[in-house]
Amino acid sequence: MVWFKMMSAIEWAEKYRPRTLEDVVGNKKAVRDFRAWAEEWQSRIPETRAVILYGPAGIGKTSSAHALARDMDWDVIELNASDQRTAGVIEKIAGSAASMNTLFGSKRLIILDEADNIHGTADRGGMRAISGIIKGTLQPIVLIANDIYGLTPTIRNLCLEIKFGSVQSRSMVPALKKVCGAEGVYCSQEALLQIAENAGGDFRSAINDLQAAASGKEKLEVEDIGTAGRDVKENIFKAMQKIFKSTDCKKALESAYGLDESPEDLVHWIDENLPIQYARKDGNLEDIKTGFGYLSKADLYLGRVKKRQNYRMWRYASMLMVCGAALSKTKPYPGFIKYQQPSLWRRLGQTRSKRDMRDNIASKIGEHSFESMHYSRNNLLGLYSRMLKDEESAVEVTANLGLELEELMYLTGSAKASKKLQKIYDKAQKLLEEGKNETADPDFFKAPVPAVDNKQRTLSCPVIIQEEEEKPQKEGSAGKSDPPGPHSSERKQKTLNMGFDSLLETSEKKENSEKKENSGYLLVDDPKPAEKNLFSFSPSLLEKKNFSESVEQKTSSKPSKKGNPANNEPSKQKILDKVTPTESVQDNAGDGAKKAEPKNQKTLFDF
């Protein structure tokens, strides 16, 4: 049930959103200017390719943009604060949409909602990407902002600025009455006016208040609005009038306590309007002097609040500033006075982009120099500004810190981007693209690469695949078998050189020469056919003479004719003592084929 009510409240706000520009409540002049800008896109690309709609929340800026798209029959692409709006995302979505036409040739409206809130690490580079897209867009772009000074001067110079003001209460009443008729709820004129006044110029809030009041009811009166409406805050301009024109301290304090302003903000309002109220032709300078005396004492208490974090002193500060301003006058000051917003806030708003840019540069310097932003802002900004005077060092600083063109202008104190600054920025971007500015990893981070010794020589044993011995002849020819010996049967050998082809060819061609002393290949009697034996060893571990005899003995395909094969047993046994593998060697000497395992037999791994 609760979920249904929440969905119902959200649905009401969207249900009566303006469908066309004619349905937008209030701001008729702003709507006309907005439509005139859009109509220029029908015939040509206008000089200002983007527009900024700025003003308080809930007055119809976003609704006007969507209503315009319906009136012009344009497609809509929107990026709001819930989306990630980094430079890459903006260029991928808005940039591609701005550079391409639709399938049927119609326009595409690109809406960037809450554009003044694109800042911080999450949206790094977003402002720069927006300015680049606006310069080359082929589609209309709408930027929506609450604070016009939250946008960079570069973007503001490229756009048409249209201000949307707060909707007047009298303009809200007909629209609220139309909503009541559509929902079947009767609401008196006085109740509708009360809802509109409570909204404070926010038409969206007025609709939400109407839904809250009409929930479960079919009839609304003024009495129902008092409990169903939102908390009503005192208007600051009405409060200023009560403070300066009243002689009752209690009423003035009640008016101040009803404000949605902290004492730190209220003191600026009184400071700005005190001379306007009392510095008139019929005014008294003593009233101004007395009023500022109380105001200075209130400021002392506010300073102690910040220093000691004791917010109980707000009470004393409020009494001094409000009662002092109300009771400092020696005579009443009738007539209408147009009170003004604190000029300090206007100046801060005008310099906000510069201060944000300064802090952003200080943050980059701090990350590069391992210092805090506060220290970099106070001590290193001037140093880096002097470094930018030299063009070569300016390119390196711009590339290393990742400075934007606007930040480069700020550090050099230039009002606009000169050709020299543009050249420095382009060179820095080229360095970044080529990766020349990236610092190489230290040697201890690199994987060790073994040095290659060209003089080193390694012998590789070939893989010898031995086939099964041929089956003995028939029983009748058993007595006519070949003479006993290790080479009594034919074997097929297949060798695979492990990288030393030239060494293998030399050993095959000159098997009986003395050059075999520099190379060695072991013939392994392996009882398992097709089993690979890979061994690598150094010839220095073997006696060259015995090794040469071993190779000559192994490569001999026929037994010696000069003597009995048994006469060769001593030399054969001597060779096997040094180089035979772990496999037992079959000794065929004599009539009975006995298996002999030589004593002190060594394997290849023993070398």
Swiss-Prot record:
Residues 548-558 have a biased composition (Polar residues). The gene is rfcL. It comes from Methanosarcina acetivorans (strain ATCC 35395 / DSM 2834 / JCM 12185 / C2A). Keywords: ATP-binding, DNA replication, Nucleotide-binding. ATP binds at residues 55-62. It holds the Pfam family AAA. The lineage of its organism: Archaea, Methanobacteriati, Methanobacteriota, Stenosarchaea group, Methanomicrobia. One of its GO terms (biological process) is DNA replication. Part of the RFC clamp loader complex which loads the PCNA sliding clamp onto DNA. GO terms for molecular function: ATP binding; ATP hydrolysis activity; DNA clamp loader activity. Heteromultimer composed of small subunits (RfcS) and large subunits (RfcL). Belongs to the activator 1 small subunits family. RfcL subfamily. SUPFAM superfamilies: P-loop containing nucleoside triphosphate hydrolases. Residues 468-607 are annotated as: Disordered. This is Replication factor C large subunit. Residues 506-518 have a biased composition (Basic and acidic residues). InterPro entries: AAA+_ATPase (IPR003593), ATPase_AAA_core (IPR003959), P-loop_NTPase (IPR027417), Rep_factor-C_lsu (IPR023935), RFC_lid (IPR047854). The keyword Nucleotide-binding applies.
